[in-house]
Every structure is written in structure tokens, then in C-alpha cells.
């Protein structure tokens, strides 16, 4: 793989974990998967039932989990020689918290974030998997996590916009936006190969868009 550290991003249902796992297996990469299970973040299911009450708790718990995981994983790897692929980029904490928290809570949260993650390496390439909301909802229903089944279209749309707003502000990263609405890289090997080939192209720092 051309890049030593790749982060796959997107909203829930975009296929981040599946793609990251397949690439790590095919390229003998070190895989970092986000820890989101209810036993890791006990506030997650409660948040989907009562967002206003549990938003701050769920975001702070994710912040701590992501920091500890990346600190442990990246600290034991050689970023110049190992190939590392993750199914998230830490900035998703800011994107989700901006959507979920009140303004005063977000201000406090972002201060914590900037302190904690100031020394965590950025990926050489961030890949954003774009799917329209209908595709996302289909995938969410298909995988059947109980706490995700009540997610509304508007919430996914706001998260998508949050990602786009974040991406526009990044001037020092390679970011690849892949529109995967017309392919199925999970079920179709040829589509998966097309995704890998797109990721493995040489990109300058900046934003790049491809429709597959």
C-alpha cells in the first residue's frame, strides 16, 4: 500500500469497518477498529433513547476510548514501516459532538479534544465513504443493531454535512471522498478492487473526489 497510515471514515452504515478489515487482511496491515460496543460505551444505547440527557456522557466516553486505543496501538507501531489502517479518524469526535452537544458543552468538549489529541499522528490519507441516506439506512437495518434502528434520516444528513464542513477546513491533509452509491464493495470483488486501486493512487495534500 502506498500510504503507511490510512483512516477510513463515513457515517454509520457506510462500510468503514468492512472495508478496513478487508484491506488489512489483503495487505497484511495493522488494523485499528473503533470500540463502540455497549459494553465499551454504556451510554450509547441510552443516547439513542434520550439524546439530550446522554449526549455529553456518550461523547466524553468515546473521546477517552479513542485516545486510549490510538495511544496504545500507534505507540507500538512503526509509522514509517508498518501499514496501519483504521476505521475512524479521531476528528469524528468533533464532528459528532458538534451535532449532538449544546454549544457550551461543545466548547468544553473541543478544548479537551485539542489537548488530548495534539500529539496523535494524523493519517497519511483519510478516505471518506459517501453513501446517500437511503443506502445508509438500508445498511443500518441490515446489520440489525437494536440501538441504531431509530436513527432518523435528518440525523444522518446533518452528520454528512458535518463531515463535509470538517473536510473543507483541512488544509494539511490528503482526503479522498469516494462516492460508492453505484458499487457494492462488500459483495462484489471487482468493486472492492476498484476501491483499493482508488485509495492506492498518489494524491497531493488537499481534497480529492471520485465517483466509482
Descriptions of predicted regions:
Residues 11:
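P-loop (Walker A) phosphate-binding loop of NTP-binding proteins
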Residues 19-20, 24:
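Post-Walker A alpha-helix
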Residues 8:
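Hydrophobic anchor at the beta1->P-loop junction of P-loop NTPases
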Residues 93-161:
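A glycine- and Lys/Arg-enriched "phosphate-lid" helix/loop adjacent to the NTP-binding pocket
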Residues 16:
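Conserved lysine of the Walker
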Residues 141-150, 154-212:
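NTP-dependent small-molecule kinase module
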Amino acid at each position: 500500500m502506498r500510504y503507511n497510515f490510512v483512516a477510513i471514515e463515513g457515517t454509520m452504515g457506510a462500510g468503514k469497518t468492512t472495508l478496513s478489515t478487508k484491506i488489512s487482511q489483503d495487505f497484511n496491515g495493522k488494523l485499528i477498529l473503533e470500540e463502540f460496543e455497549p459494553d465499551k460505551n454504556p451510554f450509547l444505547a441510552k443516547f439513542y433513547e434520550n439524546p439530550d440527557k446522554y449526549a455529553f456522557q456518550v461523547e466524553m466516553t468515546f473521546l477517552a476510548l479513542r485516545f486510549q486505543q490510538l495511544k496504545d496501538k500507534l505507540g507500538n507501531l512503526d509509522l514509517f514501516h508498518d501499514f496501519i489502517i483504521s476505521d475512524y479518524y479521531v476528528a469524528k469526535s468533533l464532528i459528532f459532538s458538534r451535532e449532538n452537544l449544546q454549544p457550551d458543552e461543545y466548547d468544553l468538549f473541543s478544548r479537551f479534544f485539542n489537548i488530548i489529541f495534539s500529539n496523535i499522528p494524523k493519517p497519511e490519507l483519510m478516505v471518506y465513504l459517501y453513501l446517500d441516506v437511503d443506502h445508509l439506512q438500508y445498511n443500518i437495518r441490515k446489520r440489525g443493531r437494536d440501538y441504531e434502528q431509530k436513527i432518523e434520516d435528518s440525523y444522518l444528513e446533518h452528520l454528512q454535512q458535518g463531515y463535509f464542513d470538517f473536510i473543507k477546513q483541512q488544509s494539511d491533509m490528503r482526503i479522498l471522498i469516494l462516492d460508492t452509491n453505484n458499487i457494492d464493495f462488500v459483495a462484489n470483488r471487482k468493486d472492492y478492487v476498484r476501491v483499493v486501486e482508488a485509495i492506492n493512487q498518489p494524491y497531493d495534500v488537499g481534497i480529492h473526489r471520485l465517483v466509482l
